[in-house]
Amino acid sequence: MKILISNDDGFQAPGIVALHDALKDIADVEVVAPEHNNSAKSNALTLAAPLYVHKAHNGFRYVTGTPADCVHIALKGLLGYRPDLVVSGINNGANMGDDTIYSGTVGAAMEAYLFGIPAIAFSQIEKGWAHVDAAAQVARRLVQQIERERMLDGGAFLLNVNVPNRPLQELKPIQVCRLGRRHSAEKVITQESPRGETMYWIAGAGGAKDSGEGTDFHATAAGHIALTPLQIDLTDHANLGQWRETVARLGN
């Protein structure tokens, strides 16, 4: 089994190091990750500037670009082979509910999925890397189970996994659940620059809004690992008919 590992926190982040160490003896692993933190870059690709790839002392390769850049470059020329699985993370903080739209961690996994390769994004629900090795063991066990069941042979899938920051023995079993929703983001933070200009900082994400039973928020709050299968199709299928009728009334 060949696995490509990436992330959005950068190639030196504890999460990607722990993930690599947990997977390196069950697969041939290659790390291609951003040079610097690229949180909230989603699926962004760098199109107006060249990208450079460097190799760190530990063998990790790092790119002067986004998480999606890293996976794109790796799959379309850098590796020279097609990996069986792409794993992204472990992210420093949750990627639940609406977070998945913005997440560079999910974006890296989604880039692989767009190329028809199975992919998993792993995140811890709290920042700070507490018990990151436990989250890495969760990743290892899930990857092993997926391989045992030969799911890598059945076409591409995209999974989003969020792990509570707990010791391994205190983690509750994986629950397969849907994405919840967050309240809208907090008000932007304004400051005055030394030149007297107003600066704006994006504030934190809103709290959980839809966190009922069956959501990723509910599962992780109860100590469970949350696993959500994702898809690319953004079509609002339920309202296609309504919009066809509306457009029809416009005439020619």
From Swiss-Prot:
The answer to keyword Magnesium applying to this record is: no
Q: Where in the cell is it found?
A: Cytoplasm
Gene from which the chain derives:
surE
Free-text remark on how the cofactor is bound: Binds 1 divalent metal cation per subunit.
List, in alphabetical order, the Gene Ontology terms for molecular function in this entry.
3'-nucleotidase activity; 5'-nucleotidase activity; exopolyphosphatase activity; metal ion binding; nucleotide binding
Nucleotide-binding as a keyword of this entry, yes or no, is yes
Which GO cellular component terms are attached?
A: cytoplasm
**Alphabetically ordered keywords of this record:** Cytoplasm, Hydrolase, Metal-binding, Nucleotide-binding
Instruction: Give the similarity note.
Output: Belongs to the SurE nucleotidase family.
Here the disulfide bonds are none
- Which InterPro entries does this entry report, sorted A to Z? SurE, SurE-like_Pase/nucleotidase, SurE-like_sf
Q: What does this protein do?
A: Nucleotidase that shows phosphatase activity on nucleoside 5'-monophosphates.
Binding-site positions, a divalent metal cation: 8-9, 39, 91
SUPFAM superfamilies documented for this protein: SurE-like
Any matching Pfam family = SurE
Please list the cofactors this protein needs. Answer: a divalent metal cation
Which reaction is catalysed here? a ribonucleoside 5'-phosphate + H2O = a ribonucleoside + phosphate
Extract the NCBIfam families matched here. PRK00346.1-3, PRK00346.1-4, surE
For this entry, the protein name equals 5'-nucleotidase SurE
Which PANTHER family does the annotation name? 5'-NUCLEOTIDASE SURE, 5'_3'-NUCLEOTIDASE SURE
Q: What is its EC number?
A: 3.1.3.5
Q: Which HAMAP family match?
A: SurE
